[in-house]
């Protein structure tokens, strides 16, 4: 299909000149008349590698129909309305060399606008937003204790024994002892007892 002079459509790039290519016409667009009273027609054409939009000036554009196999020489490619377009040059020629018998590829459209892909810059070393510095889950405290309760820092001198918390216990109260009362035997006075005996002794 391609000789030394012709290139496949997939290799056409913006700014490329002296393009020689063979393609089959797929669609014919509406003619546009310029201020210089020149007529230009847009075509969608394809070959086995890709398809592209072609603008052909003046009389050759009027003679081309869908299904024609065309050889275009000394064309150039540029961007028009964000689309890659192939143009017939002033010194170029357009030849019809056949009809219908050509394989073409429409899945690769060189004239589709190329949208710039936005790439998100991810920094794996950065701490994700919303996570605490300790690495815990959002809403949970980092290692060390519950939220809002400060943990005491205990610093021990090197070589000192571990300090144990001293617990002071209050001494147990002694059981209360009830006071004992001493009862002395009462002395009978008057007539009874020793007084009476004494009197008897004196009488004897």
UniProtKB/Swiss-Prot annotation:
Bias kind Low complexity: ranges: 122-131, 139-183
Matching InterPro entries: NA-bd_OB-fold, SOSS-B
Residue ranges for the DNA-binding region feature of this UniProt entry: 24-94
GO BP annotations, alphabetical order: DNA repair; double-strand break repair via homologous recombination; mitotic G2/M transition checkpoint; response to ionizing radiation
Protein name: SOSS complex subunit B homolog
Stretches with biased composition (Gly residues): 187-198
Keywords for this protein: DNA-binding
Family: Belongs to the SOSS-B family.
Gene Ontology MF term list: DNA binding; single-stranded DNA binding
GO cellular component: cytoplasm; nucleus; SOSS complex
């Amino acid at each position: 299909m391609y000789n030394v002079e012709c290139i496949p459509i997939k290799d056409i790039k913006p700014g490329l000149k002296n393009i020689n290519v063979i393609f089959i016409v797929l669609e014919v667009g509406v003619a546009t008349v310029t201020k210089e009273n020149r007529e230009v027609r847009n075509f969608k054409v394809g070959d086995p590698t890709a398809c592209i939009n072609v603008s052909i000036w003046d009389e050759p554009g009027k003679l081309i129909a869908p299904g024609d196999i065309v050889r275009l020489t000394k064309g150039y490619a540029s961007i028009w309305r964000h689309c890659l377009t192939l143009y017939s040059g002033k010194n170029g020629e357009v030849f019809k060399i056949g009809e219908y018998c050509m394989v073409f590829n429409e899945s690769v459209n060189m004239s589709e606008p190329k949208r710039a892909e936005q790439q998100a810059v991810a920094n794996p070393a950065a701490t994700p937003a919303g996570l605490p510095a300790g690495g815990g889950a959002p809403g949970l405290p980092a290692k060390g204790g519950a939220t809002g309760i400060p943990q005491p820092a205990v610093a021990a001198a090197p070589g000192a024994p571990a300090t144990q918390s001293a617990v002071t216990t209050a001494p147990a109260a002694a059981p209360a002892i009830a006071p004992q009362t001493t009862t002395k035997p009462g002395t009978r006075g008057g007539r009874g007892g020793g007084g009476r005996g004494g009197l008897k002794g004196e009488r004897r």
